[in-house]
């Protein structure tokens, strides 16, 4: 479940996901994949469920992003978030 977006509900990622609003911050070429990955995160109730399908390339990050996780949208873009208590917090596109 997605609990919060890093940019808040007025940010481009939240507006894209919740309202279907396009943004110059989100490339048109990744819109369908991005929506699908956000749906996967929204429906997840356990961290383990994020490992499947393997195309998610779910990983726990390290270094300066320790405590954060990510799912690949494509080779260039990924969704980064903190997974706590069965939910994703502060999700953003990078």
Identify the meaning behind each predicted range.
Residues 77-79:
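Histidine-centered metal-chelating micro-motifs
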């Amino acid at each position: 479940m997605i609990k919060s977006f890093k940019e808040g509900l007025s940010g481009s990622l939240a507006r894209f996901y919740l309202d279907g609003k396009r943004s110059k911050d989100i490339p048109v070429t990744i819109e369908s994949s991005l929506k699908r990955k956000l749906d996967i995160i929204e429906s997840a109730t356990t961290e383990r469920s994020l490992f499947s399908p393997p195309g998610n390339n779910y990983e726990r990050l390290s270094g300066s992003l320790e405590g954060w996780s990510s799912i690949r949208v494509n080779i260039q873009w990924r969704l980064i978030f903190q997974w706590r208590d069965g939910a994703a917090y502060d999700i953003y596109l990078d």
